[in-house]
Amino acid sequence: DTVQNTTIPIVIPANGSLVAKRRVELYAEVQGIFQTSGKLFKPGQKYRGGETLIRIDAAEYYAGVQSAKSNLYNAIAAIMPDLRLDFPEVFQKWQTYLNNFDLNKTTPTLPELTSDKEKYFITGRGIVSNYYTVKNQEQRLAKYNIRAPFSGILTEALVTEGSLVRNGQKLG
């Protein structure tokens, strides 16, 4: 007899439960009505990384964010005549900022404050405070859409579409 080396597959029959290698629990950080997002939010549903799991109605909060952006825009527009007279060297960068300001996009970073006089003037008019209020609200607005951190399968769903979701509530 001749012996030959070959690969023999090893099969191990096993019974038991699988435990996910990566598992996260979903909690709401905002309150609102759970809206449809294209896929049913049910156990067994597959999601790709970055795909929307849950959309919470943000219409009211969005209106507040837009109002804050408008207030920031108006505050900057109100100081433009003073900038033209008292700070002609920085007027153009603020004019460019206003021209590029779009209420339907993320608020752009404020121009760099180059001198102490400019810094005191801009800060004294509440521009910096308004800017950070808007940025804070934009960050919170993003929490109305909960996205899958990685590809996987939903194993638990504790809310249904159309129900009220409360801040801190476990979703799945």
Predicted features by range, described:
Residues 6-9, 23:
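Terminal hydrophobic membrane-targeting helix
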Residues 16:
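Active-site-adjacent helical/loop segments in soluble small-molecule enzymes
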Residues 28:
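Conserved phosphate/oxyanion-binding catalytic-loop motifs
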Residues 1-6, 19, 31, 35-36, ...:
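Periplasmic scaffold and linker elements that assemble and bridge Gram-negative envelope complexes
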